[in-house]
């Protein structure tokens, strides 16, 4: 992958992280990522650093899914509120 594609993937996973945090679901799952200090806006960072950040984001997201079923996450009122505010079409029956 090119660096631009890596950064786009990093940004996508970062947005998922923020979604979980805003819903109150992430409880320390992204501590290692936060400590790394590499965010998608840090375009001057190396491709390797962005790959490490992606790996840590994936780890945090997978830990959330390991602890909670997708059904539990979907039924979470906090997450539902966040999803409705950013993508209401996903919540329509």
UniProtKB/Swiss-Prot annotation:
SUPFAM superfamilies: Vng1086c-like. It comes from the Archaea. Belongs to the UPF0058 family. This is UPF0058 protein AF_0738. It comes from Archaeoglobus fulgidus (strain ATCC 49558 / DSM 4304 / JCM 9628 / NBRC 100126 / VC-16).
């Amino acid at each position: 992958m090119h660096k631009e594609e890596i950064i786009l993937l990093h940004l996508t996973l970062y947005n998922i992280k923020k979604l979980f945090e805003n819903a109150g679901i992430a409880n320390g799952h992204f501590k290692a990522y936060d400590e790394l200090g590499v965010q998608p806006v840090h375009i001057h960072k190396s491709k390797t650093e962005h790959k490490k950040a992606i790996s840590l984001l994936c780890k945090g997201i997978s830990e959330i899914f390991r602890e909670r079923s997708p059904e539990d996450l979907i039924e979470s009122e906090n997450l539902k509120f966040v999803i409705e505010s950013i993508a209401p079409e996903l919540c329509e029956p």
